[in-house]
């Protein structure tokens, strides 16, 4: 689909998805995802949008405001937001981003663990495994090849790569949780 929001460039695309009852009960699942080109001045504020949001900044920069803090993100950084809480994000300079609103039975647990170790805005040594999976999610919708178990696996792979990076590079309590 094409967005008609102000400050979203026309080449931007996004997809909306409603998972099955089985998918909601046992999988990670995307709700909306896309590849956006934001013009300078884009800003969005929400009191809530029941999901978690993963953004990968391919080019440019973004700013993020959660209920407690403000952050800046630049190219090759990820942003992870709990959209159940008030939040804002936008860009002053323009940016190109891959993004996915997702949820699932374990989404909050993964979110809390990742953010507690990496923060809301973070980079990882090699973003390609995570960005390739994010692109695969978007491509699944583009090609109308929707397989809930596979979409869940892609989201799980992305989140797990963040946890493994956290454990490997932060050497903290999460290592015991991840390595058994």
Residue ranges and their predicted role:
Residues 37-40, 83, 138-145, 162-169:
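A general structural signal marking secondary-structure boundaries and capping sites
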Residues 29-32, 53-56, 129-133, 154, ...:
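Amphipathic, well-ordered alpha-helical segments in soluble domains
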Residues 24-118:
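N-terminal regulatory/effector-sensing and dimerization cores
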Residues 1-29, 140, 146, 167:
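A short, N-terminal "cap"/entry segment at the start of jelly-roll beta-barrel domains
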Residues 113-135:
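Aromatic/histidine-rich interaction motifs
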Residues 43, 117-123, 144-145, 169-170:
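Short, polar/flexible loop-turn hinges at active-site or ligand-entry regions and domain interfaces
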